[in-house]
């Protein structure tokens, strides 16, 4: 039996939070003794406390993927003899979580072609590092911090929420997309890296109000405004400004766009996957990309920037027709008060015309995308299932 682990992670519906929950579940199911310490954000830092789940978090309500959350918390609530510490969070928090005379393991991710300069010393505090993609492994290796880097992908969801035909029809009416023959959708926060303005401009350029298409944008309540200060503003206002500018530039009424700038439960997010015909993202880069991963797991075609960690599950251009052409560009400093992104880094940028062309091509002939999506979903079902990835995770944490 492996020795025990003290496991630090967020209990929240973020990429870090959901990926860590799946990893924690895999460790428990593999018989590894684990005590879970839940991280809570506190300004620029975090606090940590042993899990004590007195009620289901709001984001987990009715979510089939989190039905076992109470049981998972109960299985990891008590102290265990441990010789390893796993911190599933950004490296800035590792120093306060790692323990002397223990094997300290950091699980993290990055999205550009170079790591933040201040990460070098933080990464050196770990005994090993776990990242979710080959793209990340290359970036971390280039940093030459002298710490072993292991690639363990995020796990395929073990359950999704079902949505019957009547529920799908009702949701389409509520979202105003009941007349659309093709529904594009995206699930991304409103921040510079996700580049939602390019997607909105491309959609307005690609289609008219008469076209039977729609775009559903699930985003955050607040977003970041224009550089260099990136003021926090309501995402609805930011999106409307982009759409208004695009409409003026095109000189015609826009196609149907529905903005959802609020938090949603896992069940609500899965409902978008169920009614959407194609997931689309003009992101500048992803370490893995859980939104696209879930869409691909369900067999939805993905149209997305062709650079980043998502290539591990979407594949190369020959097998994935949804790869959007890109060029590598300099990254603006962000966030302005304490940047981790710097101009010495590069990420991928897609052009409005190229995205618009890809959207029109999908509507004209979606079958190549659907066939590829079926193959990708089959690969994910086989290669990213818990028994497969769980074994890789245990090996990364325990093979000395």
Annotate the PLM regions:
Residues 346-355, 363-395:
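A charged, aromatic-enriched C-terminal amphipathic alpha-helix characteristic of glycosyltransferases
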Residues 1-82:
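N-terminal pre-catalytic "stem/leader" segment of glycosyltransferase-like enzymes
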Residues 284:
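Aromatic "clamp/platform" in nucleotide-sugar-dependent glycosyltransferases that forms part
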Residues 301-304, 314, 319-325:
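Short hydrophobic beta-strand element within catalytic cores of glycosyltransferases
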Residues 5, 177-194, 200-203, 215-217:
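Conserved donor-binding/catalytic core segment of Leloir-type glycosyltransferases
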Residues 223-267:
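Nucleotide-activated donor-binding/catalytic signature segment of Leloir-type glycosyltransferases, i.e.
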Residues 47-143:
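Extended catalytic core of nucleotide-activated donor transferases of GT-like folds
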Residues 161-177:
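A short helix/loop element that forms part of the nucleotide-sugar donor recognition site in Leloir-type
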């Amino acid at each position: 039996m492996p020795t025990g682990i003290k496991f630090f992670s967020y209990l929240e519906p973020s990429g870090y939070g959901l990926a860590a929950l799946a990893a924690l579940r895999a460790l428990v199911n593999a018989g590894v003794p684990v005590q879970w310490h839940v991280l809570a954000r506190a300004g620029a830092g975090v606090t940590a406390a042993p899990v004590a789940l007195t009620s289901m978090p709001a984001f987990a309500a009715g979510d089939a993927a989190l039905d076992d959350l109470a049981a998972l918390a109960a299985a990891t609530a008590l102290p265990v003899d441990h010789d390893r510490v796993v911190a599933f969070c950004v490296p800035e928090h590792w120093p306060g979580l790692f323990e002397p005379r223990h094997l300290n393991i950091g699980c993290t991710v990055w999205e550009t072609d170079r790591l933040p300069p201040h990460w070098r010393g933080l990464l050196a505090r770990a005994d090993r590092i776990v990242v979710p993609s080959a793209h990340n492994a290359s970036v971390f290796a280039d940093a030459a911090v002298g710490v072993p880097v292991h690639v363990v992908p995020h796990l395929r969801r073990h359950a999704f929420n079902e949505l019957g035909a009547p529920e799908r029809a009702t949701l389409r009416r509520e979202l105003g997309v009941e007349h659309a023959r093709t529904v594009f959708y995206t699930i991304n926060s409103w921040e510079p890296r996700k580049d939602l303005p390019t997607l909105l401009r491309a959609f307005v350029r690609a289609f008219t109000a008469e076209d039977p298409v729609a775009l559903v944008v699930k985003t955050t309540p607040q977003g970041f405004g224009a550089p260099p200060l990136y003021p926090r503003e309501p995402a609805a206002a930011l999106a409307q400004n982009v759409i208004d500018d695009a409409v003026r530039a095109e000189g015609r009424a826009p196609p149907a766009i529905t903005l959802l700038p609020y938090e949603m439960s896992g069940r609500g997010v899965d409902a978008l996957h169920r009614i959407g015909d194609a997931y689309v993202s003009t992101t500048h880069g992803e370490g893995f990309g859980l939104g696209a991963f879930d869409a691909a797991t369900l067999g939805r075609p993905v149209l997305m920037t062709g650079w980043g960690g998502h290539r591990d599950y979407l594949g190369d251009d020959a097998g994935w027709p949804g790869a959007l052409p890109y060029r590598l560009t300099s990254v603006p400093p962000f966030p302005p008060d304490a940047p981790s992104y710097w101009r010495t880094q590069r990420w991928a940028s897609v052009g409005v015309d190229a995205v618009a062309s890809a959207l029109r091509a999908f509507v004209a002939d979606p079958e190549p995308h659907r066939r590829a999506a079926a193959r990708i979903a089959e690969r994910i079902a086989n290669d990213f299932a818990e028994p497969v990835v769980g074994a890789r995770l245990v090996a990364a944490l325990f093979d000395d």
